[in-house]
Each structure stands twice: as structure tokens, then as C-alpha cells.
């Protein structure tokens, strides 16, 4: 009994593998994946569009599998048992069953679609290169231009920061010197005012009030002078902002010119790339559709004589055991044929 069950599971696995290799499965699945993979990118965030496409894919897989299993006489329990058997755990079987597993696992589905999107882009670029000999400027020069501009921008920013730090340090040094000199000059009036208060309390106020006022006026004039100097220095320190970060002695140290056009240039290059690749990708997909349509037509034409012969030599209906035996023979013949061809 155990041997019979193992044989049955092996037969189910082999029949499903044969179906997944055939055109009835691979052509509609590949058409769907190639048409829908364009929106998939390698980001952690999953968009709502991804979920909708996954649901469409799941419905397509269920429809194809259901029609095949019904035709061959395999029920759902046998199918589940075959998918969980050790025969289905091998590397070859897992690669064949990946499109089926992707219908149930969104992570596998997304990885499959991202990989197909990258493959389609690389194929489009390869076709362009084979036809023209070289790639167009929009697919080669854009990255170099952006990197050069970024390097130039970093040089300018470093120079600006260095110059600004030097000017800031110089300004702070001037302030410290002025504060120390002002502190030294302010010490006598404090002493004089205290003396004036003491003498004023003793009754000689009129004699000392006049000197204190003179001292006050004198230091008021002194305090106006450093303020005027600070006002004169303001245009020098603010000139970087007013002149677009132009530093004296550095002709190239400016944020204008190519850096100002960085964002516009990058956007235009990316737009050209996207448009160019989309055109070639559409051509590639149309070529593949034509090839698959011819393949389906050829398989149908090859199948017609055998169907007519079967109808002409109609035999009584076979039993389930005879069907299984016949299917095993066919699968064995196909397997031997593949091994001979591969050798």
C-alpha cells in the first residue's frame, strides 16, 4: 500500500511538472508577468497596485490549474499532497513550482516580478546595443554628468564652509579684543562714579558731579565707534548670501551655473531614459507575443492529425488504471527523450 501511494504521488508530481513546463501554462503566465512587472521596483514599501496585481495573478493560476487537474483526474487533496511531498522539495522542483507558490506567497510573487522587470530592462538595453553598436547618450552620459556635478558641488560647499569658518573666527577674535579693551577703559568711570557718590554724601557733590558727567559722555562716544565698525563689517560677512555664495579669490566657488541646473538636467535625463527604454520594451514584448502566437499555432496544427486519428479509430472508454498507465508511459517517453537530447 505504501509503495502504491508513493507511486501515485510520484505520478502526480511528474504530471504537474510536465504541465508547468508546457505551453498551456508557461505562455499565459509569462504574458501576464511581462505585462505587469513594469510597475514593480525593489523597495521595502508595498503599494496597493502590487496587491491588486497579485490577486489577478492568483485568479489566473487557479483557473489554469483547475482546468488541468479536472482534465487529468487529480483532485485537490492529491495536488496538496504532491506539493508537500519530498519529491517537490528538490531544487529543480522548487524552481518549476515557483510560479505556483507565488500565487499564495506575496513575498515570492514580488521578488519574481522585480526580477522579471530587471531582466526586461537589461534585454531592452542589450537589443539597443546589438542593433546600434553603442548605447545612446541618454543611457550612458547621464550618470557621469550627475556625478561630476555632484563632485563640483561638494568642492564648492567645502570651500564655502572653510571660508565662512575663517571669517567667523576672525570676527570672534575682533569681538574678544574689543570687549577686553572696552572693559579696561570702563574701569576708571566706575571708580570715579563711586568716588563721586562717596564725596556727594559728604557734601561736596557739586565739585564731583561735573567730572562724572564728562566721563560718561566720553565713554558714550567711545562705545559708538565700535558699533559703527560693526555696521561697516556687516556687508562683508553677508556678501556671501547676497552674491550667491561667491567667495573673493575663488572664481569657481559659486552655486550658480551647472549646479543650479543639476535638478533640471537630472530630471530630463531620467525622463529620456524612461521613454527610450519603454519604447524598446514595448517592441520586445510585441515580438515575444508574435513568437508565442506562432508557437501555439504550430502546436495546434501538430495536434490536429493525432486528434483526427483518435476520432477515426475510436476505442471503448478506458478505465482509470489504463489512463494512469498510458500517462506514465507518455511521461516516461518524454523523460527519456529529454535525457537523450541533453546528452
UniProtKB/Swiss-Prot annotation:
PTM-bearing positions, type Phosphoserine: 85, 147, 201
Biased composition (Basic and acidic residues): 301-323
Primary localization class, coarse: nucleus
Keyword presence, rRNA-binding: no
The protein's name: Cilia- and flagella-associated protein 36
Subunit comment: Interacts with ARL3.
Purpose: May act as an effector for ARL3.
Region ranges (Disordered): 165-191, 286-323
Annotated GO CC locations: axoneme; ciliary base; ciliary transition zone; motile cilium; nucleus
Protein source organism: Rattus norvegicus (Rat)
Coiled coil, from the record: 147-181
Location of this chain's protein in the cell: Nucleus; Cytoplasm; Cell projection, Cilium, Flagellum
Entries under InterPro entries matching the protein: BART_dom, BART_sf, CFAP36
Entry annotated with the keyword Cytoplasm: yes
Tissue expression profile of the protein: Widely expressed (at protein level).
Family: Belongs to the CFAP36 family.
Key words, A-Z: Cell projection, Cilium, Coiled coil, Cytoplasm, Flagellum, Nucleus, Phosphoprotein
Amino acid at each position: 500500500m505504501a509503495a502504491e501511494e508513493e507511486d501515485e504521488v510520484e505520478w502526480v508530481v511528474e504530471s504537474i511538472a510536465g504541465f508547468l513546463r508546457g505551453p498551456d501554462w508557461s505562455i499565459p503566465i509569462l504574458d501576464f508577468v511581462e505585462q505587469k512587472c513594469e510597475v514593480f521596483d525593489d523597495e521595502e514599501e508595498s503599494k496597493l497596485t502590487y496587491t491588486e496585481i497579485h490577486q489577478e495573478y492568483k485568479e489566473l493560476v487557479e483557473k489554469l490549474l483547475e482546468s488541468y487537474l479536472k482534465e487529468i483526474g487529480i483532485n485537490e487533496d492529491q495536488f496538496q499532497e504532491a506539493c508537500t511531498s519530498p519529491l517537490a522539495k528538490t531544487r529543480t522542483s522548487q524552481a518549476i513550482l515557483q510560479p505556483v507558490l507565488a500565487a499564495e506567497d506575496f513575498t515570492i510573487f514580488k521578488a519574481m516580478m522585480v526580477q522579471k522587470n530587471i531582466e526586461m530592462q537589461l534585454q531592452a538595453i542589450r537589443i539597443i546595443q546589438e542593433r546600434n553598436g553603442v548605447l545612446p547618450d541618454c543611457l550612458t552620459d547621464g550618470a557621469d554628468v550627475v556625478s561630476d556635478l555632484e563632485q563640483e558641488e561638494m568642492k564648492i560647499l567645502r570651500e564655502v564652509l572653510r571660508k565662512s569658518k575663517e571669517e567667523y573666527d576672525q570676527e570672534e577674535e575682533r569681538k574678544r579684543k574689543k570687549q577686553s579693551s572696552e572693559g579696561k577703559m570702563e574701569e576708571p568711570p566706575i571708580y570715579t562714579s563711586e568716588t563721586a557718590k562717596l564725596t556727594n554724601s559728604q557734601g561736596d557733590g557739586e565739585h564731583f558731579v561735573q567730572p562724572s558727567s564728562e566721563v560718561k559722555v566720553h565713554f558714550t562716544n567711545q562705545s559708538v565707534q565700535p558699533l559703527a565698525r560693526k555696521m561697516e563689517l556687516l556687508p562683508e560677512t553677508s556678501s556671501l548670501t547676497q552674491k550667491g555664495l561667491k567667495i573673493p579669490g575663488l572664481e569657481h566657488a559659486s552655486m550658480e551655473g551647472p549646479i543650479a541646473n543639476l535638478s533640471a538636467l537630472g530630471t530630463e535625463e531620467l525622463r529620456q531614459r524612461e521613454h527610450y527604454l519603454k519604447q524598446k520594451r514595448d517592441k520586445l514584448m510585441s515580438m515575444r507575443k508574435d513568437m508565442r502566437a506562432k508557437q501555439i499555432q504550430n502546436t495546434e496544427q501538430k495536434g490536429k492529425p493525432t486528434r483526427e486519428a483518435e476520432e477515426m479509430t475510436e476505442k471503448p472508454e478506458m478505465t482509470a488504471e489504463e489512463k494512469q498507465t498510458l500517462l506514465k508511459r507518455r511521461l516516461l517517453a518524454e523523460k527519456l527523450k529529454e535525457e537523450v537530447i541533453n546528452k
